[in-house]
Amino acid sequence: MNLHEYQGKQLFAEYGLPVSKGYAVDTPEAAAEACDKIGGTEWVVKAQVHAGGRGKAGGVKLVRSKEDAAAFAQQWLGKRLVTYQTDANGQPVTKILVESCTHIAKELYLGAVVDRSSRRIVFMASTEGGVDIEKIAHDTPEKILKATIDPLVGAQPFQGRDLAFQLGLEGKQVTQFAKIFTGLAKLFQDHDLALLEVNPLVIKADGDLHCLDAKINIDANAMYRQPKLKGFHDPSQDDPREAHAAKFELNYVALEGNIGCMVNGAGLAMGTMDIVNLHGGKPANFLDVGGGATKERVTEAFKIILSDTNVAAVLVNIFGGIVRCDMIAEGIIGAVKEVGVKIPVVVRLEGNNAELGAKVLAESGLNIIAATSLTDAAQQVVKAAEGK
Protein backbone atom coordinates (compact mmCIF):
# COMPACT_ATOMS: atom_id res chain seq x y z
CA MET A 1 0.00 0.00 0.00
CA ASN A 2 1.37 3.39 -1.01
CA LEU A 3 1.17 6.50 1.16
CA HIS A 4 0.86 10.10 0.05
CA GLU A 5 3.78 12.43 0.64
CA TYR A 6 1.99 14.27 3.46
CA GLN A 7 1.23 10.97 5.21
CA GLY A 8 4.84 9.87 4.90
CA LYS A 9 6.01 13.15 6.39
CA GLN A 10 3.63 12.66 9.32
CA LEU A 11 5.44 9.41 10.07
CA PHE A 12 8.83 11.09 9.58
CA ALA A 13 7.88 13.77 12.12
CA GLU A 14 6.83 11.11 14.65
CA TYR A 15 10.37 9.72 14.46
CA GLY A 16 11.97 13.12 14.95
CA LEU A 17 13.11 13.55 11.36
CA PRO A 18 13.43 17.07 9.90
CA VAL A 19 10.49 17.87 7.60
CA SER A 20 8.89 21.09 6.37
CA LYS A 21 5.94 22.56 8.24
CA GLY A 22 2.90 21.89 6.10
CA TYR A 23 -0.79 21.11 5.86
CA ALA A 24 -2.76 18.81 3.56
CA VAL A 25 -5.89 20.63 2.37
CA ASP A 26 -8.86 19.82 0.18
CA THR A 27 -10.27 23.29 -0.65
CA PRO A 28 -8.75 26.48 -2.13
CA GLU A 29 -9.78 28.40 1.01
CA ALA A 30 -7.93 25.93 3.22
CA ALA A 31 -4.84 26.32 1.01
CA ALA A 32 -4.84 30.08 1.65
CA GLU A 33 -5.35 29.52 5.39
CA ALA A 34 -2.44 27.08 5.44
CA CYS A 35 -0.14 29.81 4.13
CA ASP A 36 -1.16 32.03 7.05
CA LYS A 37 -0.57 29.21 9.55
CA ILE A 38 2.87 28.41 8.16
CA GLY A 39 3.96 32.03 7.88
CA GLY A 40 6.64 33.46 5.63
CA THR A 41 6.42 34.83 2.10
CA GLU A 42 7.06 31.71 -0.02
CA TRP A 43 5.37 28.32 -0.01
CA VAL A 44 5.46 25.15 -2.08
CA VAL A 45 2.15 23.60 -3.15
CA LYS A 46 2.07 19.96 -4.24
CA ALA A 47 -0.70 17.84 -5.74
CA GLN A 48 -0.95 14.59 -3.77
CA VAL A 49 -1.05 11.48 -5.96
CA HIS A 50 0.56 8.04 -5.78
CA ALA A 51 3.00 8.75 -8.61
CA GLY A 52 6.32 10.42 -9.23
CA GLY A 53 7.11 13.04 -11.85
CA ARG A 54 4.64 15.56 -10.42
CA GLY A 55 6.93 18.55 -10.90
CA LYS A 56 7.36 18.07 -14.64
CA ALA A 57 3.59 17.61 -14.99
CA GLY A 58 2.80 20.90 -13.23
CA GLY A 59 1.78 19.28 -9.96
CA VAL A 60 4.37 21.12 -7.84
CA LYS A 61 4.71 24.91 -7.74
CA LEU A 62 6.45 27.65 -5.77
CA VAL A 63 3.98 30.40 -4.84
CA ARG A 64 4.57 33.81 -3.27
CA SER A 65 1.02 34.69 -2.23
CA LYS A 66 -1.81 32.85 -0.58
CA GLU A 67 -4.00 33.82 -3.56
CA ASP A 68 -1.65 31.86 -5.83
CA ALA A 69 -1.83 28.90 -3.43
CA ALA A 70 -5.63 29.00 -3.58
CA ALA A 71 -5.51 29.26 -7.38
CA PHE A 72 -3.25 26.18 -7.57
CA ALA A 73 -5.67 24.23 -5.37
CA GLN A 74 -8.58 25.41 -7.53
CA GLN A 75 -6.70 24.25 -10.62
CA TRP A 76 -5.94 20.73 -9.41
CA LEU A 77 -8.49 19.59 -6.81
CA GLY A 78 -10.96 17.23 -8.45
CA LYS A 79 -8.77 16.94 -11.55
CA ARG A 80 -6.46 14.14 -12.69
CA LEU A 81 -2.69 14.52 -12.81
CA VAL A 82 -0.90 12.66 -15.62
CA THR A 83 2.80 11.92 -15.11
CA TYR A 84 5.29 9.52 -16.68
CA GLN A 85 4.43 7.04 -13.90
CA THR A 86 0.65 7.04 -14.50
CA ASP A 87 -1.43 5.80 -17.40
CA ALA A 88 -3.07 8.19 -19.85
CA ASN A 89 -5.95 8.80 -17.44
CA GLY A 90 -3.69 9.95 -14.62
CA GLN A 91 -4.47 9.92 -10.90
CA PRO A 92 -7.20 11.97 -9.17
CA VAL A 93 -6.08 14.85 -6.94
CA THR A 94 -8.08 15.05 -3.70
CA LYS A 95 -5.46 16.73 -1.48
CA ILE A 96 -2.95 19.54 -1.87
CA LEU A 97 0.09 19.76 0.41
CA VAL A 98 1.00 23.34 1.30
CA GLU A 99 4.36 23.64 3.03
CA SER A 100 7.09 26.14 3.81
CA CYS A 101 9.68 26.86 1.14
CA THR A 102 13.11 25.31 1.64
CA HIS A 103 16.18 26.97 0.11
CA ILE A 104 18.37 24.18 -1.24
CA ALA A 105 22.17 24.13 -1.45
CA LYS A 106 22.52 20.48 -2.56
CA GLU A 107 20.30 17.47 -3.22
CA LEU A 108 21.07 13.91 -2.06
CA TYR A 109 19.20 10.60 -2.25
CA LEU A 110 18.43 8.20 0.60
CA GLY A 111 16.20 5.15 0.32
CA ALA A 112 15.66 1.63 1.64
CA VAL A 113 14.18 -1.60 0.31
CA VAL A 114 13.93 -5.22 1.37
CA ASP A 115 16.64 -7.09 -0.52
CA ARG A 116 15.19 -10.53 -1.28
CA SER A 117 18.56 -12.18 -1.95
CA SER A 118 20.16 -11.21 1.37
CA ARG A 119 16.84 -11.10 3.27
CA ARG A 120 17.90 -7.82 4.80
CA ILE A 121 16.84 -4.18 4.71
CA VAL A 122 19.31 -2.40 2.46
CA PHE A 123 19.78 1.38 2.51
CA MET A 124 20.96 3.18 -0.61
CA ALA A 125 22.41 6.68 -0.74
CA SER A 126 23.72 8.85 -3.55
CA THR A 127 25.04 12.32 -4.21
CA GLU A 128 22.68 12.39 -7.21
CA GLY A 129 19.44 13.42 -5.50
CA GLY A 130 16.24 14.72 -7.05
CA VAL A 131 16.40 12.40 -10.07
CA ASP A 132 15.23 8.87 -10.88
CA ILE A 133 17.37 6.48 -8.82
CA GLU A 134 16.78 3.66 -11.32
CA LYS A 135 18.44 5.78 -14.01
CA ILE A 136 21.43 6.43 -11.75
CA ALA A 137 21.73 2.73 -10.92
CA HIS A 138 21.69 1.90 -14.64
CA ASP A 139 23.98 4.65 -15.95
CA THR A 140 26.39 5.18 -13.04
CA PRO A 141 26.01 2.32 -10.53
CA GLU A 142 29.22 3.38 -8.77
CA LYS A 143 27.34 6.41 -7.44
CA ILE A 144 24.99 4.20 -5.39
CA LEU A 145 26.26 3.64 -1.84
CA LYS A 146 24.76 0.79 0.20
CA ALA A 147 24.44 -0.26 3.84
CA THR A 148 22.88 -3.57 4.90
CA ILE A 149 20.95 -3.69 8.18
CA ASP A 150 21.53 -6.68 10.45
CA PRO A 151 18.07 -7.64 11.81
CA LEU A 152 19.60 -8.76 15.11
CA VAL A 153 21.06 -5.37 16.11
CA GLY A 154 19.30 -2.97 13.71
CA ALA A 155 20.78 0.09 12.04
CA GLN A 156 23.89 1.37 13.77
CA PRO A 157 25.02 5.02 13.95
CA PHE A 158 28.46 4.08 12.59
CA GLN A 159 26.78 2.88 9.37
CA GLY A 160 25.11 6.25 9.01
CA ARG A 161 28.39 8.07 9.65
CA ASP A 162 30.16 5.89 7.09
CA LEU A 163 27.56 6.75 4.43
CA ALA A 164 27.74 10.42 5.41
CA PHE A 165 31.52 10.55 4.90
CA GLN A 166 31.17 8.82 1.52
CA LEU A 167 28.55 11.42 0.53
CA GLY A 168 31.01 14.18 1.34
CA LEU A 169 29.15 15.47 4.38
CA GLU A 170 31.09 17.15 7.17
CA GLY A 171 30.75 18.58 10.65
CA LYS A 172 27.23 18.62 12.09
CA GLN A 173 25.88 17.10 8.86
CA VAL A 174 27.46 13.74 9.71
CA THR A 175 25.62 13.56 13.04
CA GLN A 176 22.38 14.74 11.42
CA PHE A 177 22.65 12.12 8.67
CA ALA A 178 23.32 9.33 11.18
CA LYS A 179 20.20 10.35 13.12
CA ILE A 180 18.08 10.41 9.94
CA PHE A 181 19.52 7.05 8.88
CA THR A 182 18.76 5.29 12.17
CA GLY A 183 15.34 6.96 12.43
CA LEU A 184 14.32 5.81 8.96
CA ALA A 185 15.55 2.29 9.68
CA LYS A 186 13.42 2.11 12.84
CA LEU A 187 10.42 3.48 10.95
CA PHE A 188 10.97 0.91 8.19
CA GLN A 189 11.01 -1.99 10.63
CA ASP A 190 8.27 -0.74 12.97
CA HIS A 191 5.77 -0.26 10.15
CA ASP A 192 6.60 -3.27 7.94
CA LEU A 193 7.62 -1.16 4.96
CA ALA A 194 8.57 -2.57 1.58
CA LEU A 195 10.12 0.64 0.24
CA LEU A 196 11.11 4.03 1.60
CA GLU A 197 12.61 6.98 -0.28
CA VAL A 198 13.69 10.49 0.62
CA ASN A 199 14.32 12.01 -2.79
CA PRO A 200 15.68 14.52 -2.34
CA LEU A 201 17.30 14.64 1.05
CA VAL A 202 18.64 18.18 0.87
CA ILE A 203 21.36 20.28 2.41
CA LYS A 204 19.70 23.62 3.16
CA ALA A 205 21.32 27.00 2.67
CA ASP A 206 22.21 27.02 6.39
CA GLY A 207 23.96 23.64 6.06
CA ASP A 208 21.36 21.50 7.86
CA LEU A 209 19.92 18.30 6.36
CA HIS A 210 16.21 18.20 5.56
CA CYS A 211 13.77 15.54 4.27
CA LEU A 212 12.13 17.34 1.37
CA ASP A 213 10.08 14.41 0.08
CA ALA A 214 8.68 11.14 1.44
CA LYS A 215 7.78 8.04 -0.54
CA ILE A 216 6.55 5.03 1.43
CA ASN A 217 5.19 1.65 0.40
CA ILE A 218 3.89 -0.73 3.07
CA ASP A 219 4.01 -4.50 2.66
CA ALA A 220 0.37 -5.41 1.93
CA ASN A 221 0.84 -8.81 3.59
CA ALA A 222 1.63 -7.08 6.89
CA MET A 223 -1.34 -4.71 7.00
CA TYR A 224 -3.05 -6.83 9.65
CA ARG A 225 -0.20 -5.78 11.96
CA GLN A 226 -0.58 -2.09 11.13
CA PRO A 227 -4.14 -1.03 12.10
CA LYS A 228 -3.10 2.62 12.34
CA LEU A 229 -1.85 2.67 8.75
CA LYS A 230 -5.05 1.15 7.35
CA GLY A 231 -6.66 4.56 7.81
CA PHE A 232 -4.02 6.04 5.49
CA HIS A 233 -5.36 4.07 2.53
CA ASP A 234 -6.70 6.33 -0.23
CA PRO A 235 -9.06 4.26 -2.43
CA SER A 236 -9.25 7.07 -5.01
CA GLN A 237 -5.69 6.15 -6.06
CA ASP A 238 -6.54 2.50 -6.73
CA ASP A 239 -7.37 1.18 -10.19
CA PRO A 240 -11.15 0.51 -9.91
CA ARG A 241 -10.77 -2.88 -11.58
CA GLU A 242 -8.00 -3.91 -9.18
CA ALA A 243 -10.08 -2.74 -6.22
CA HIS A 244 -13.11 -4.71 -7.46
CA ALA A 245 -10.95 -7.81 -7.98
CA ALA A 246 -9.58 -7.60 -4.44
CA LYS A 247 -13.12 -7.86 -3.03
CA PHE A 248 -13.37 -11.34 -4.61
CA GLU A 249 -9.80 -12.31 -3.65
CA LEU A 250 -8.70 -12.09 -7.27
CA ASN A 251 -5.20 -10.81 -8.00
CA TYR A 252 -5.59 -8.42 -10.94
CA VAL A 253 -3.15 -5.96 -12.48
CA ALA A 254 -4.20 -3.90 -15.50
CA LEU A 255 -1.80 -3.76 -18.46
CA GLU A 256 -1.95 -2.10 -21.87
CA GLY A 257 -2.50 -5.00 -24.30
CA ASN A 258 -5.63 -6.46 -25.93
CA ILE A 259 -5.57 -10.10 -24.78
CA GLY A 260 -7.31 -10.77 -21.49
CA CYS A 261 -5.71 -13.49 -19.35
CA MET A 262 -7.40 -15.57 -16.66
CA VAL A 263 -5.17 -18.12 -14.92
CA ASN A 264 -5.05 -20.04 -11.65
CA GLY A 265 -1.70 -19.55 -9.95
CA ALA A 266 0.61 -16.53 -10.06
CA GLY A 267 3.54 -18.43 -11.59
CA LEU A 268 1.38 -19.94 -14.32
CA ALA A 269 -0.16 -16.51 -14.92
CA MET A 270 3.26 -14.93 -15.48
CA GLY A 271 4.29 -17.82 -17.74
CA THR A 272 1.06 -17.40 -19.71
CA MET A 273 1.74 -13.70 -20.23
CA ASP A 274 5.28 -14.51 -21.38
CA ILE A 275 4.17 -17.05 -23.98
CA VAL A 276 1.42 -14.74 -25.28
CA ASN A 277 4.07 -12.06 -25.71
CA LEU A 278 6.42 -14.58 -27.35
CA HIS A 279 3.83 -15.29 -30.05
CA GLY A 280 3.26 -11.62 -30.84
CA GLY A 281 0.38 -10.83 -28.50
CA LYS A 282 0.08 -8.19 -25.79
CA PRO A 283 -1.55 -9.18 -22.47
CA ALA A 284 -4.22 -6.78 -21.24
CA ASN A 285 -3.85 -7.90 -17.64
CA PHE A 286 -2.45 -10.23 -15.04
CA LEU A 287 -5.27 -12.13 -13.32
CA ASP A 288 -4.83 -14.98 -10.87
CA VAL A 289 -8.14 -16.56 -9.82
CA GLY A 290 -6.35 -18.65 -7.19
CA GLY A 291 -6.84 -22.30 -6.38
CA GLY A 292 -10.64 -22.25 -6.25
CA ALA A 293 -11.69 -21.45 -9.81
CA THR A 294 -15.42 -21.58 -9.01
CA LYS A 295 -18.14 -20.32 -11.32
CA GLU A 296 -18.65 -17.26 -9.13
CA ARG A 297 -14.99 -16.26 -9.22
CA VAL A 298 -14.66 -17.01 -12.93
CA THR A 299 -17.77 -14.90 -13.58
CA GLU A 300 -16.34 -11.94 -11.67
CA ALA A 301 -13.01 -12.44 -13.42
CA PHE A 302 -14.72 -12.23 -16.82
CA LYS A 303 -16.56 -9.08 -15.76
CA ILE A 304 -13.31 -7.43 -14.69
CA ILE A 305 -11.44 -8.44 -17.85
CA LEU A 306 -14.26 -7.29 -20.13
CA SER A 307 -14.51 -3.93 -18.36
CA ASP A 308 -11.35 -3.12 -20.33
CA THR A 309 -12.66 -2.04 -23.74
CA ASN A 310 -9.30 -2.82 -25.36
CA VAL A 311 -9.70 -6.56 -24.81
CA ALA A 312 -10.28 -8.35 -28.14
CA ALA A 313 -9.92 -11.96 -26.95
CA VAL A 314 -9.57 -13.85 -23.67
CA LEU A 315 -7.20 -16.69 -22.80
CA VAL A 316 -8.24 -18.93 -19.90
CA ASN A 317 -5.39 -21.16 -18.73
CA ILE A 318 -6.32 -23.50 -15.87
CA PHE A 319 -4.38 -26.33 -14.30
CA GLY A 320 -6.74 -28.70 -12.53
CA GLY A 321 -5.26 -30.18 -9.38
CA ILE A 322 -7.75 -30.82 -6.62
CA VAL A 323 -10.43 -29.07 -8.67
CA ARG A 324 -11.56 -31.19 -11.65
CA CYS A 325 -11.23 -29.67 -15.13
CA ASP A 326 -14.78 -30.71 -16.12
CA MET A 327 -16.14 -28.70 -13.19
CA ILE A 328 -13.97 -25.76 -14.22
CA ALA A 329 -15.25 -26.07 -17.80
CA GLU A 330 -18.85 -25.95 -16.57
CA GLY A 331 -17.98 -22.86 -14.54
CA ILE A 332 -16.46 -21.18 -17.60
CA ILE A 333 -19.52 -22.00 -19.71
CA GLY A 334 -21.86 -20.66 -17.02
CA ALA A 335 -19.79 -17.50 -16.67
CA VAL A 336 -19.66 -16.90 -20.43
CA LYS A 337 -23.44 -17.25 -20.64
CA GLU A 338 -24.11 -15.05 -17.61
CA VAL A 339 -21.73 -12.27 -18.60
CA GLY A 340 -22.67 -12.44 -22.27
CA VAL A 341 -19.14 -12.66 -23.64
CA LYS A 342 -19.12 -11.57 -27.29
CA ILE A 343 -15.40 -11.90 -28.02
CA PRO A 344 -13.47 -15.14 -28.67
CA VAL A 345 -12.46 -17.15 -25.60
CA VAL A 346 -9.57 -19.62 -25.83
CA VAL A 347 -9.39 -22.19 -23.03
CA ARG A 348 -6.49 -24.45 -22.16
CA LEU A 349 -7.22 -27.06 -19.49
CA GLU A 350 -4.59 -29.39 -18.07
CA GLY A 351 -4.60 -31.85 -15.21
CA ASN A 352 -7.45 -33.66 -13.44
CA ASN A 353 -10.18 -34.66 -15.99
CA ALA A 354 -8.70 -32.35 -18.66
CA GLU A 355 -10.05 -34.44 -21.58
CA LEU A 356 -13.56 -34.45 -20.14
CA GLY A 357 -13.31 -30.70 -19.59
CA ALA A 358 -12.32 -30.14 -23.23
CA LYS A 359 -15.28 -32.27 -24.33
CA VAL A 360 -17.69 -30.23 -22.20
CA LEU A 361 -16.39 -27.01 -23.79
CA ALA A 362 -16.63 -28.43 -27.31
CA GLU A 363 -20.26 -29.48 -26.79
CA SER A 364 -21.32 -26.14 -25.28
CA GLY A 365 -22.11 -24.50 -28.62
CA LEU A 366 -20.48 -21.28 -27.42
CA ASN A 367 -17.68 -19.29 -29.02
CA ILE A 368 -15.08 -21.11 -26.91
CA ILE A 369 -11.94 -22.47 -28.52
CA ALA A 370 -10.41 -25.47 -26.73
CA ALA A 371 -6.61 -25.44 -27.03
CA THR A 372 -4.51 -28.61 -27.01
CA SER A 373 -1.45 -27.07 -25.35
CA LEU A 374 -0.21 -23.80 -23.90
CA THR A 375 1.63 -22.99 -27.13
CA ASP A 376 -1.51 -23.74 -29.14
CA ALA A 377 -3.55 -21.58 -26.75
CA ALA A 378 -1.19 -18.63 -27.17
CA GLN A 379 -1.19 -18.94 -30.96
CA GLN A 380 -4.98 -19.28 -31.08
CA VAL A 381 -5.68 -16.28 -28.85
CA VAL A 382 -3.23 -14.05 -30.76
CA LYS A 383 -4.98 -14.96 -34.03
CA ALA A 384 -8.39 -14.39 -32.45
CA ALA A 385 -7.37 -10.98 -31.13
CA GLU A 386 -6.19 -10.02 -34.61
CA GLY A 387 -9.53 -11.13 -36.06
CA LYS A 388 -8.05 -14.04 -38.02
Curated annotation (Swiss-Prot):
Cofactor(s) it depends on: Mg(2+)
Listed InterPro entries: ATP-grasp, ATP-grasp_succ-CoA_synth-type, ATP_grasp_subdomain_1, Succ-CoA_synthase_bsu_CS, SUCC_ACL_C, Succ_CoA_ligase-like_bsu, Succinyl-CoA_synth-like
Pfam families: ATP-grasp_2, Ligase_CoA
Chain positions recorded as ATP binding sites: 46, 53-55, 99, 102, 107
GO molecular function: ATP binding; magnesium ion binding; succinate-CoA ligase (ADP-forming) activity; succinate-CoA ligase (GDP-forming) activity
Function per UniProt: Succinyl-CoA synthetase functions in the citric acid cycle (TCA), coupling the hydrolysis of succinyl-CoA to the synthesis of either ATP or GTP and thus represents the only step of substrate-level phosphorylation in the TCA. The beta subunit provides nucleotide specificity of the enzyme and binds the substrate succinate, while the binding sites for coenzyme A and phosphate are found in the alpha subunit.
Ranges that cross the membrane: none
Family: Belongs to the succinate/malate CoA ligase beta subunit family.
Domain (ATP-grasp): residue spans on this chain: 9-244
Residues involved in Mg(2+) binding: 199, 213
Record's subunit section: Heterotetramer of two alpha and two beta subunits.
Enzyme superclass (EC): ligase
GO biological process: succinyl-CoA metabolic process; tricarboxylic acid cycle
Positions with a binding annotation for substrate: 264, 321-323
Record-given protein name: Succinate--CoA ligase [ADP-forming] subunit beta
EC number in record: 6.2.1.5
GO cellular component: cytosol; succinate-CoA ligase complex
Pathway in which this enzyme or protein is active: Carbohydrate metabolism; tricarboxylic acid cycle; succinate from succinyl-CoA (ligase route): step 1/1
Ranges in coiled-coil conformation: none
Keyword annotations of the record: ATP-binding, Ligase, Magnesium, Metal-binding, Nucleotide-binding, Tricarboxylic acid cycle
Comment on bound cofactor: Binds 1 Mg(2+) ion per subunit.
Catalytic activity: succinate + ATP + CoA = succinyl-CoA + ADP + phosphate; GTP + succinate + CoA = succinyl-CoA + GDP + phosphate
